[in-house]
């Protein structure tokens, strides 16, 4: 007896969640998140979307990495030790060069309405509450990448 199985739904989803950078290659993302499980899971989701991810644990490391490397999107947790995401974002914006123009995404479990409504629009381009599922993360990063294409 022949049995034909239909493709697994997640195979279709994974294919549709592929991202590409404005330059046509794999998007390069910087992820700053102090919580190990969240950092590991978020990085894995981003890698599954075709992104190259550099993950750091606090804002100071994010600022240093942004000054030394070029990224297509920088994702910053708001509440981190040593340097919080807001301070890191403002430092990145003020450093000039390619980093200053890189789309910044706020990621926080305590995301205030002021972030979502644009009160920090001069600092962050996109705000995403945690926990974010794969589809929400994909849409936010996709929007950030498209924003970069428009401004480039």
Set out the residue ranges of the language-model regions.
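Active-site beta3 strand of CheY-like receiver
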Residues: 70-75
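Charged docking surfaces used in two-component/phosphorelay signaling
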Residues: 40-48
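Receiver (REC) domain active-site loop signature in two-component systems and cognate sites
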Residues: 80-83, 92
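Helix N-cap/capping motif at the beta->alpha junctions
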Residues: 55-64, 85
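Hydrophobic/aromatic residues positioned on beta-strands within the core alpha/beta folds
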Residues: 105-107
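Conserved acidic carboxylate
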Residues: 33
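Alpha4 helix (beta4-alpha4-beta5 surface) of REC/receiver domains from two-component response regulators
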Residues: 87, 110-130, 135, 139
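C-terminal catalytic ATP-binding subdomain
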Residues: 1-19, 142
